[in-house]
């Protein structure tokens, strides 16, 4: 049953992308043809057009299933019936699947690349976007070869706009609109920086970015969407203090995640947040947490899966969070004097004799004072490992806040 659920999950989540890509029409409108390119008049008043290539032979039968083999140069302007039009858009599906084009030179008049406009359209690993381009539609630049593209002028990124590219860094900018799954399955992505001032990160933004090992989150961030970091590769992360909900699948399938620092304000932890986080050794749920889904921490336990490393769960709440998650073989640490209430509440009761009431909440900032000779690795409050902890400083150690 677990394996079936795992497969269904993959189908449901990836199906969103597949269906979205295939259910829209692949034919662009063509009002006139010049030099084997089709043009759609957008505005007679402004004299603007969108451009596409008739790969399916709807308007130019001799081009059916034939791809250009030289650099594609799209002009700034084109003349038809004595009127000069500015080329301001790549039409939806305009140059989709023209794999044989070595490179594309875009017009300086271009403002928009519409849905699927340059999806798998060229073999080059680099694309220059004119400064005038401010809009990338859904699936606009999907291309496994693409390693470098200038995006600083873009104000709108549609769903999956840069999915499946080979970019190595991502910079999420404030005052820019991002759809879902913009960097979905960018397998070469190693670093992501979300600019200060951003409050929301859409769902699936970095889903299955399997080499994403460094993430910088701003203090302004308050809402992170479902599965935003599913399948990533960082070993530690500190969430901003104003994040209150850990949404579905947020860190699922991150097999390297060992340490995470949760904000004091977190009050709800949803389904599969830590699904198959095999490297996670321990976790501390702050006192403010009111709800933890029963499968917030969950492992499928298929024959070829790694052995989960988690040994300890720490709950600072004197009132057990509703529902609660049970992980076999794990010790549940609760505040002193709270063993009985956890032992008789929801899924927490399943821990039985593995409930230990050893959390002392009387220390400064709810931290515990430990000796300097502790063997457990220490992390600062930003989730970075500290080789030589300083006396009097607060760290995360063994899943707990501690003071040296």
Where in the sequence are the language-model features?
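Consensus positions within tandem repeat domains that build extended binding/scaffold surfaces
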Residues: 92-94, 115-117, 137-140, 158-161, ...
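Bacterial N-terminal signal peptides
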Residues: 11-20
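Boundary at the C-terminal end of the N-terminal hydrophobic targeting segment
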Residues: 23-30
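Structural signature of tandem-repeat unit edges
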Residues: 46, 67-89, 99-112, 122-135, ...
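Residue-level detector of functionally pivotal "anchor" positions at catalytic/ligand-binding pockets or at interdomain
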Residues: 358-385
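C-terminal tail/sorting-segment detector
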Residues: 394-404
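LRR flanking "cap" motifs
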Residues: 30-96, 180-187, 191, 250
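Bacterial N-terminal signal peptides that target proteins for export
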Residues: 2-12
